[in-house]
């Protein structure tokens, strides 16, 4: 898979997630955004929300269920805009906003 295909899968994933969850943004991050991907790379996706709901433990499995409809290579995480979170900071700096 190349970067263009990963971006297209991320777009499809964003559309599917948006139908079930109020999201603020979605980023493709990791090896595809840093151009270090290989044939075995997964597709790291950060789903940004305003607030983690009380149903965090329901929202996370939802993201994984939706991924099965798009691609099993997708590895989603759910985050808030917390500049003190190193993962969020890395996603915003190096990720591709979808």
Positions of predicted regions on the chain:
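Catalytic core of pol beta-like nucleotidyltransferases
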Residues: 1-25, 33-39, 50-98
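Short glycine- and acidic-residue-rich catalytic loops of nucleotidyl-transferase/cyclase enzymes
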Residues: 41-43
